[in-house]
């Protein structure tokens, strides 16, 4: 029986490996070769259809239940298994939701486009959402409470109650616990909405692996631009602030995402200046306190300065060293033979023997802990400070008394200093498995959080000796935190060498020239295409991409005068370039799709210089209707909104008017009917989640 069971188990393992071998590898999928386009890529509107038809399968629910959504699924394997383990629990499911905006019962506008500068784009007909869920595709019945897989039918198999599948699917689009959630409009503009690595609930996919996958996906589908709102968290802290001062940029910059414009009208130059300013603050600003008692901040900084092999001078040096210690997993012992030493072996042994004598003297009648600071002070005249620091760093684990005793060390969380004492070898057998010369990872994370709250975060920053330095640090940190939007431009230099490749710009004859034009669309035509073929292909492209262009017709090519439609296009424009066309489209019933910002004629003119929605909380003036940042008018984000608000311009105009009685003027606290803050109305209207927390790990 044992042999038979073992044999069956082996067969099942081989079968599992054979099935998973047919799946694409998550770490390499998708690639240009997989898509069959090793040199050129079609426009996104065409490439996404080919991608889904080639790699995905239509999943439940079918489009007959609700015509606005179509769901697809692609199964991937995270890597090859070499130990025969069951890979079914380690498969990655990529769900693709194709949303027809014109048939959707939800908001047709994209709030994410509005806050990154794409608010003037026409509403796209379709959105493609790429989701890797952290949980399974199960739904709980509202009547009996039992859960079942969605592929098992639209009725509960326990009580036969009809399940609201459409509502469940839409709720998934608003969930911020997904490991990955990205949306790509049919014009090729994309948003990364959600990314959660191991700290965000991922079992085996790291944040970096997920980000690599998203970047490859965008590249292979010929995405034009992709945005991300960097609100990522690491170790419970704002990672854009930590990564900004240690690397000089956002974590997403490693994949080509660049800062374009920030909230509160911040520019790229202001962002870089803030990063440079905060990174270069010298640690000496916090160490010299005159006759004041030694603080916890002073102890922590001195502690890590003594641990580092290189000199820690600035804020950047300090935080970079702590993050490096966490990454390198300080509990793992380092090989002392690989450490380059500037001193001879006899010099090191001489200093360490002196320290051993001090430990022996302090250990009578019982072994007492001696701090690193006390040891350094006791032998400061016998060797250079650099040699003493080196010997202390490698002091833990030194054998004495013919190997019967050993130097034991620990990190005291109360004093943030190392302590040493002599112990019997039998009591410290664990030293062979861990490096006691370094603080534990959890201890370093605890110190990192303390330093972050004391030195970096503007709301919790401590008082320093120099008030000017503190104000400068608060200003720089606030600017870094205000810069959340980053964009990557996927510039494609590859063109089809056996076709005509044109960027087609459109101008509507029934609109003013000042009206915003849609982004140009890329057209790929055969070499023998005529002007007539160009008009047909251009009309088809814009009709497929934008809802307002449903009845779009091309009238003429601009810049070429009156030309015959039968002229070969290659002789007119060549095989590459930009062409402008003029057309007309009946907008009857389609005006709501004119721009992603919606049909409301709202205006932003804040004193900080902001002229458009940037995703921050705003308030409209009850006098002129112009929107202003609540923070810029003195209202903190945590404070309640006033029932009535007048901007500075209206107050100035009001003060110049003849005075009225109190009864006519009315109270400034009278509520305005239907009053809603812009930040809140945008969130309610779009159903989107702009403040999603991204956790990388």
Curated annotation (Swiss-Prot):
What CDD domains does the record point to?
PHD_MMD1_like
Q: Which residue spans match zinc fingers labelled PHD-type?
A: 603-653
Q: Which of UniProt's keywords are assigned here?
A: Metal-binding, Nucleus, Transcription, Transcription regulation, Zinc, Zinc-finger
Q: Does the keyword Transcription apply?
A: yes
The question of whether Metal-binding is a record keyword is answered with: yes
**Pfam families tied to this protein:** PHD (PF00628)
Q: Can you tell which superkingdom this protein's organism belongs to?
A: Eukaryota
Protein name per its UniProtKB record = PHD finger protein At1g33420
Source organism per UniProt = Arabidopsis thaliana (Mouse-ear cress)
